[in-house]
Swiss-Prot record:
Belongs to the bacterial ribosomal protein bL20 family. This is Large ribosomal subunit protein bL20. NCBIfam families: rplT_bact (TIGR01032). It comes from Pseudomonas fluorescens (strain SBW25). One of its GO terms (biological process) is ribosomal large subunit assembly.
């Protein structure tokens, strides 16, 4: 049986990993064994952080809405309760955008929520 030479396949595999590791510091971008570990770890971080990004943005939106609501004399939880009671369905992303950039519009929404609670 003939000997199988894997030079072409190995080079292709190495080039693929080293291409993914381009821009990494030191041996992480040059040495195959280290680069492979770095690429695997980077993939794990990317997977984890795609999920964390959703949580972090929601927390940011809530913080911005809370700040805007408190300026208008209402806490976040009371504001959200008022919106639910008034059946105003605006998501937190849009509310946060309004609280930061459209203060007058946000104040009007807070007043509606306040009126519903009273």
């Amino acid at each position: 049986m003939a000997r199988v030479k894997r030079g072409v396949i190995a080079r292709k595999r190495h080039k693929k990993i080293l291409k993914l590791a381009k821009g990494y510091y030191g041996a992480r971008s040059r040495v195959f064994r280290v680069a492979k570990q770095a690429v695997i770890k980077a993939g794990q971080y990317a997977y984890r952080d795609r999920r964390q990004k959703k949580r972090q943005f929601r927390a940011l939106w809530i913080a911005r809405i809370n700040a805007g609501a408190r300026v208008n004399g209402l806490s976040y939880s009371r504001f959200i309760a008022g919106l639910k009671k008034a059946s105003i369905e605006i998501d937190r992303k849009v509310l946060a955008e309004l609280a930061v950039n459209e203060k007058a519009v946000f104040a009007a929404i807070v007043e509606k929520a306040k009126a519903t609670l009273a």
